[in-house]
């Protein structure tokens, strides 16, 4: 299976002056934990890291002794553009691809393998987790307008897996129609293509704020105790 890791993050919400993926977490950069899990996943054979040139050297330094191919791909100005460039950088033989946010550094090898095996059946999928909070829909004035049925709500995460040709077609449609999406599954929704959810468990958080870093540190400490 081919894996693209989106690594063109910023440190704005962290209050940092550099890519949040290079901030320290339990003695290593955040993205080092993401790469460690991906490299340990049995079903991942090739990894493409999509990022900005300024981060190329420090990120590639983390995988100098990798046990499988790791390729750098220059990212774009948005996540959507970066994924499109990542797709262009895949090996010609790639038929299926997993796309993962570098900031989801608590993803374990087993999650990558589960997603890879599920994708091998042909169905597009996303890692996700059932919503446990009561969600409110509000208007522009902050007034509640609706309470969606929680049993139907899942928080979308990554990895997300797709057939390469179909995902390329989806991005071509997005460019032609001026669509802006925050994840690739949204393209499939707009085009009426089915996407399955795969329960990722509670720990697959995205490190975005200083609080998230503290949570990730605690989770990693617990794992080391086990």
From Swiss-Prot:
Pathway(s) this gene product operates in, as recorded in its UniProt entry: Isoprenoid biosynthesis; isopentenyl diphosphate biosynthesis via DXP pathway; isopentenyl diphosphate from 1-deoxy-D-xylulose 5-phosphate: step 2/6
One matching Pfam family: IspD
EC number(s) recorded for this UniProt protein: 2.7.7.60
UniProt-annotated site: Transition state stabilizer, residues: 13, 20
Keyword Cytoplasm attributed: no
Listed GO biological process terms: isopentenyl diphosphate biosynthetic process, methylerythritol 4-phosphate pathway
Known catalytic reactions: 2-C-methyl-D-erythritol 4-phosphate + CTP + H(+) = 4-CDP-2-C-methyl-D-erythritol + diphosphate
Annotated GO MF terms: 2-C-methyl-D-erythritol 4-phosphate cytidylyltransferase activity
PROSITE patterns, per database record: ISPD (PS01295)
Site label Positions MEP for the nucleophilic attack, positions: 150, 206
Keywords: Isoprene biosynthesis, Nucleotidyltransferase, Transferase
UniProt xrefs under HAMAP family: IspD
PANTHER family the UniProt entry points to: 2-C-METHYL-D-ERYTHRITOL 4-PHOSPHATE CYTIDYLYLTRANSFERASE, CHLOROPLASTIC (PTHR32125:SF4)
Sequence similarity: Belongs to the IspD/TarI cytidylyltransferase family. IspD subfamily.
The protein's role, per its UniProt record: Catalyzes the formation of 4-diphosphocytidyl-2-C-methyl-D-erythritol from CTP and 2-C-methyl-D-erythritol 4-phosphate (MEP).
Protein's name according to its UniProt entry: 2-C-methyl-D-erythritol 4-phosphate cytidylyltransferase
Source organism of the structure: Parasynechococcus marenigrum (strain WH8102)
